[in-house]
From Swiss-Prot:
GO terms for cellular component: cytosol. GO terms for molecular function: tryptophan synthase activity. The active site is at 49 (proton acceptor), 60 (proton acceptor). InterPro entries: Aldolase_TIM, RibuloseP-bd_barrel, Trp_synthase_alpha_AS, Trp_synthase_suA. It catalyses: (1S,2R)-1-C-(indol-3-yl)glycerol 3-phosphate + L-serine = D-glyceraldehyde 3-phosphate + L-tryptophan + H2O. PROSITE patterns: TRP_SYNTHASE_ALPHA (PS00167). The gene is trpA. This is Tryptophan synthase alpha chain. It is an enzyme of class 4 (lyase). Keywords: Amino-acid biosynthesis, Aromatic amino acid biosynthesis, Lyase, Tryptophan biosynthesis. Pathway: Amino-acid biosynthesis; L-tryptophan biosynthesis; L-tryptophan from chorismate: step 5/5. It comes from Thiobacillus denitrificans (strain ATCC 25259 / T1). The keyword Transcription regulation does not apply.
Length: 273
């Protein structure tokens, strides 16, 4: 079983939901990414999503776009992201790390070369934003051959037939995007999310994580009542962007600890029913 699978199995045994936290590698500085990864874990993160900087992050809103721009200005590329993961693994061998990015950097390195290097570095899964499931079979096979879980996005507009396609090739967990549009959007409709998550579960045994629009403990709790995992990105990246110099780690830890409390409150409600 993969590290991602082990994490979800252990949490399920404790009647808890996963908190998945996203940061962009190299933002705000090249030397701050690994300390931030440890800060995320210390504050209660179960799985880290590490964004691979890219010059045209079309699925991302302005907050994460700016993070990518800062990381690229810091000259952080895919090889650096893998090196950061390897550095993190010297201390932490249990928290799964998922690389989230666009196909171009992976293609440029070559999928086979990338998958081998990612496995060696200690990466557990890869979410390629712009590869649709019908085009992903060969890539997914390469990832799986190197024990990397291929993770896919589903959205409110994804038809049921496509959900079945994704279920056939996905690993790790399904990432359901709870809002139309780009990352960082607001106005979370939990009833609609609940309907969609139920539909996804009809086709797939993998855990379902829900992201986009989660801002605080209350929205994290609402989503944790529905999904197996709560995914938070823009809110954390915004905290990194606005933190005074030297306070980034402390601010992120404070925010993530609050999100963790929200996620765990949903589990406590379930226990008390």
């Amino acid at each position: 079983m993969s590290r991602i699978g082990q994490t979800f199995t252990a949490l399920k045994a404790q009647n808890r939901k996963a908190l998945i936290s996203f940061i962009t590698a190299g933002d705000p500085g090249k030397g701050l990414t690994v300390p931030l990864m440890h800060a995320l874990v210390d504050a209660g993160t179960d799985i880290i999503e590490l964004g691979v900087p890219f010059s045209d992050p079309m699925a991302d809103g302005p907050v994460i776009q700016r993070a990518s721009e800062r990381a690229l200005a810091n000259k952080v590329g895919l090889k650096d992201v893998l090196a950061m993961t390897a550095e993190f693994r010297k201390v932490n061998t249990s928290t799964p790390v998922v690389l989230m990015g666009y196909a171009n950097p992976f293609e440029h390195m070559g999928y086979e070369t990338f998958a081998e290097a990612a496995k060696t570095a200690g990466v557990d899964g890869v979410l390629t934003v712009d590869i649709p499931p019908e085009e992903s079979l060969g890539v997914s096979d390469v990832f799986k051959a190197h024990d990397l879980d291929p993770i896919f996005l589903l959205s409110p507009t994804t038809p049921e037939s496509r959900v079945a396609q994704v279920a056939a090739v996905a690993g790790g967990f399904i990432y359901y995007v709870s809002l139309k549009g780009v990352t960082g959007s607001a106005n979370l409709d939990t009833e609609e999310v609940a309907r969609k998550v139920a539909m996804v579960r009809k086709h797939c045994d993998l855990p379902v994580g829900v992201g986009f629009g989660i801002r605080d403990a209350a929205t994290a709790e609402a989503v944790a009542r529905i999904a197996d995992a709560v995914v938070v990105g823009s809110r954390i990246v915004n905290e990194i962007e606005t933190a005074p110099e030297g306070e980034c780690g402390a601010r992120v830890k404070h925010l993530v600890a609050d999100l963790r409390r929200g996620v765990d409150a949903a589990s406590k409600q379930t226990e008390n029913k």
